[in-house]
Curated annotation (Swiss-Prot):
GO cellular component: centriolar satellite; centrosome; ciliary basal body; cilium; cytoplasm; microtubule cytoskeleton
Feature: compositional bias, Polar residues: 277-287
Protein's name according to its UniProt entry: Coiled-coil domain-containing protein 14
Subunit architecture: Interacts with CEP63.
Modified residues (Phosphoserine): S124, S670, S754, S798
Species of the source: Homo sapiens (Human)
Species lineage: Eukaryota, Metazoa, Chordata, Craniata, Vertebrata
Keyword entries, A-Z: Coiled coil, Cytoplasm, Cytoskeleton, Phosphoprotein
Annotated compartments: Cytoplasm, Cytoskeleton, Microtubule organizing center, Centrosome, Centriolar satellite
A Pfam match: CCDC14
Composition bias type Basic and acidic residues, residue spans: 169-187
Coiled coil residues, start to end: 383-413, 483-618
Disulfide bonds, paired cysteine numbers: none
Residue ranges with Basic residues bias: 1-21, 145-154
Task performed by this protein: Negatively regulates centriole duplication. Negatively regulates CEP63 and CDK2 centrosomal localization.
Amino acid sequence: MKRGIRRDPFRKRKLGGRAKKVREPTAVNSFYREASLPSVWASLRRREMVRSGARPGQVLSSGRHTGPAKLTNGKKATYLRKIPRFNADSGYSIHSDSESQAETVHGLDGCASLLRDILRNEDSGSETAYLENRSNSRPLESKRYGSKKKRHEKHTIPLVVQKETSSSDNKKQIPNEASARSERDTSDLEQNWSLQDHYRMYSPIIYQALCEHVQTQMSLMNDLTSKNIPNGIPAVPCHAPSHSESQATPHSSYGLCTSTPVWSLQRPPCPPKVHSEVQTDGNSQFASQGKTVSATCTDVLRNSFNTSPGVPCSLPKTDISAIPTLQQLGLVNGILPQQGIHKETDLLKCIQTYLSLFRSHGKETHLDSQTHRSPTQSQPAFLATNEEKCAREQIREATSERKDLNIHVRDTKTVKDVQKAKNVNKTAEKVRIIKYLLGELKALVAEQEDSEIQRLITEMEACISVLPTVSGNTDIQVEIALAMQPLRSENAQLRRQLRILNQQLREQQKTQKPSGAVDCNLELFSLQSLNMSLQNQLEESLKSQELLQSKNEELLKVIENQKDENKKFSSIFKDKDQTILENKQQYDIEITRIKIELEEALVNVKSSQFKLETAEKENQILGITLRQRDAEVTRLRELTRTLQTSMAKLLSDLSVDSARCKPGNNLTKSLLNIHDKQLQHDPAPAHTSIMSYLNKLETNYSFTHSEPLSTIKNEETIEPDKTYENVLSSRGPQNSNTRGMEEASAPGIISALSKQDSDEGSETMALIEDEHNLDNTIYIPFARSTPEKKSPLSKRLSPQPQIRAATTQLVSNSGLAVSGKENKLCTPVICSSSTKEAEDAPEKLSRASDMKDTQLLKKIKEAIGKIPAATKEPEEQTACHGPSGCLSNSLQVKGNTVCDGSVFTSDLMSDWSISSFSTFTSRDEQDFRNGLAALDANIARLQKSLRTGLLEK
C-alpha cells in the first residue's frame, strides 16, 4: 500500500505537468499511456523472444536510457542510478524512500512478470523439497530497513541472511542486470568464484554466449585501462560482502560504494584449464593469476582499508609485472549501457546460473573471511583454500539455487498480482469516466453544431475504444507462456548438460590434478605469454627489416638510374643552352639589321611626307596664282571695253569736228556733252581717256624694257578726294564680281605672296591701307612680273598663241599697275620687284608678241599724233574736269596742290603736233579696231585656258 500511495502523487504531478494548456486531451493521453504500456511492452518482448530464440550472450541493459525501471521485491522497488565514478563516501541505499526513486514506467511491469513466470515454472516441480527450510523474505526487508537507520554502525550479518538477501536482490535486478552492474562499484560482489569458469564447467552454450559478449567490450575497455589504472597498485582480490551486506552498511567507515552491484568474473576453485583474462576499468582491475580473474576496488586501496566482520578483504603484495593483460572483459562502469537494450533471450540463459552461484559465493565469503582479512596474505594460499573447498561447494550449489529461486518467485508473484489487479481496476474506472465526459462534451457540442469539434470527439472515442482495458486484451500471460515454452525446454537441457559437465570436471580434477599445480603462479604464465608475444614481435620485426632492406636496395638502384638520367639530361640541357645562345646571337643580328632598315624607312617616310607637304603648299600657291590671274583677266577685259568705248567716242568727236571750227571750244563742249550723256546712260563710265591709256601703255612698255622696276621708289600716299572715291565706288556691276573675288582672296593672297617671296626670292607686296580712306574695300591689283616657274606652267596649259596673249596681258598689266600707282587710280600699294625678275620677264616673252604689241602701240600713237595741237588745252581741261578727277597733274589734297611726277608732263604734250592729229584717217581707225578685237580674242582665249587648267587640277 505504500507503493500505491507513493505513485498516486507522481501520477497527479505528471498529469498536472502535461495539462498546462489543454487538460482533457492530455489526461486522455496519460490514461491511454498508462493503460497501454504494459500490453505494448509485453507484446514487444513476446515478439522478440519468439523471433530471436537462443542467441549468443547478450545482456539487457536498461536504466536511465529508457526510463526508470520498476522492480519488485516484496514491498519495495529497487531503482538504479548511474554513478559514473566511484567515491569513498558515495554509498546509497538501494531501497530509498525518496520521491526521485518512485518514478516508474508501466512498460517494465510486463518484463518483471515475464521473468517471474519463467523462474517459477522451470523450478516448480524439481526443487520443492527445500521450500520448508526457507524463511520468508519480509523479515529480511525489515532488517534491510533497519540497517539504514544504523548506517554509522558496523554490522556482521549471519551467513544465512547474506545468502538469502543476495539471492533475493539478484532476482530483483534481473530485467536490467547488465547495465546496472556496469554502472556500479565492483567491490560489492567480489567473490572467489568466477562466473565465466563456472559457465564453462556446466554449460558450454552459456559460456560461449558470455564470451562473445565480453569480446565486444574489449575495445571500449582498452582506452579506459590506459587512462584510469592507478600506477603502482597491484591487482589484488578484495572480497566484499554480498549485496545484502552492502545494503546493511551503506555508509560504513571503510567507504565502499553500495550501489547496485556489478557482477565480476572471478576465479573458480577447481578450473579445468588455463584461461588468463584481465578486465580493467577506471576504478577496478581484474587480474588473471593462473586460472583466476579477480576484481579489486581502487577506492578500497585509496582509503584506510578498515574492515568489518561482514566485509572481509585481502590485499596480497604481488608484483605488477605478474599481471597479464591479455584480455579485457567489459562489464563495469557504464560500458554496457552504451550498447543499448539487448534481447531477453540472452538474459534468460544466464539467470539460472547466476542464481546458483550467489548462494555458494556467500558461503565462500563467510568461510574464507579469516583467510582474507589479512592484507599481507599471499595469493597461493588463497588458491589452496579454494581448492580444498571445491568439492563441498559444488555439492551445495544445485540445492541452494533452486530454494532461493522459488522463494523469490512466490514473493514477487503475490505482489505483482495484487498490484496488477489494482492497476486494471483503476484504468477501467478512468476509462469509464473519460467515456462519460466525452458523452457530456458531445452533447454540449451538438448544440453549437461545430463540425471540427465533433470530428475531434469522434476520434477521441475511437482511440479510447482501442485501449487494451476496453478491448479486453489485458490478460497476456497465456501468450507469453506459449512463447516462452521453447526457451524453457532449452533451459532444462542446458541445466542437465551443466550438471553432467560439473561432475566430469570434478572427476578430472581428482584424477589429473598435478602435484606441482600449487606452485604455478601468474608470473610463469605472464612470462610465457610475454615471451611468446616478444618472439612474435621479433619475427615480425625481422620480416619488416628484410622488407625494408629489399626496399632500400631497390631505392638505391632507382637512385643510380636517376643519376644516370640526370647526367643525360644535363648534357641535353647544355646542348640546348648552346643552341639557344647561337639562335639568340643570330636573332640579335637580324634584329639590329631590321632596326636599321626601319630607321631608313622612317627617314624615307619623313622625307616623302615633307615632299608631300611642299607639293601641297605649291599647289595652294598655284591655286592662288590662278585665281589672281583670273581676276586680272577680268580686269583687263573691263579696261579693254572701256578703251573701246573711249576710242569710239573719240572717233565720233573727230568726225563731228571735221568742219574745222575752233578746236578748243568745240572739242571741249563736245567732250562735255559726251561725258554728260555717258554719266546719264552708262552705269560704268570710263576711268581714263584714250590718251592716258596710250601713255600708260607706252610708258610701261618702254620702262619695262629699259630699266628694272626696282628703281621706282616709294612715293607718298595721297589721299584721294571725293571725286576719286566716287569713281571707285561707282564702277558698277561690270567689275563687282572681280572685286568680290579679290576681296575674298585678299588674306590668302598676301600670305601666299609672302611665303613665295621668302622661298623663291620673288617680289614682296605690302598692303598699306590709307588712314583717311573712307572706303574700307581693299583692292589688290596683280602687280608682279611673271617668275621663272610660271612660264613652264603657261607652256603646259596652252599652246603658243595663248602664251603670246598671256605675255601681252601680263606686260600690259604691269604697265597698268605702275601707271595706276602713279596716277592714284587704286588703293596705294607699295610694289617692289627684284632685278632678276625684271630682267628675266622680257627674256621669256616671245618675239612675235613683242612685234605685234609694238606695232599696235605705234599705230595708236600715230593716230593720236595726227590730232591737231589745238586740242591740247581742251584735252587737258577735259581730263581735269572729267569724272575721274585724278588724270590731272595736280590733285586737290586738303586744299593744297601737290605736284606729281607722272608721265603726263608738258614735255610729253609738246611732242605732239597739231598736224599729226589731222592725219588720223578712217583707215587707221579700222586698224586700231581690228587690233583691239584681236586683243579681246586673245584675252578670252587665255581666260578659257586658265579655267580648264583649274578644272583639271
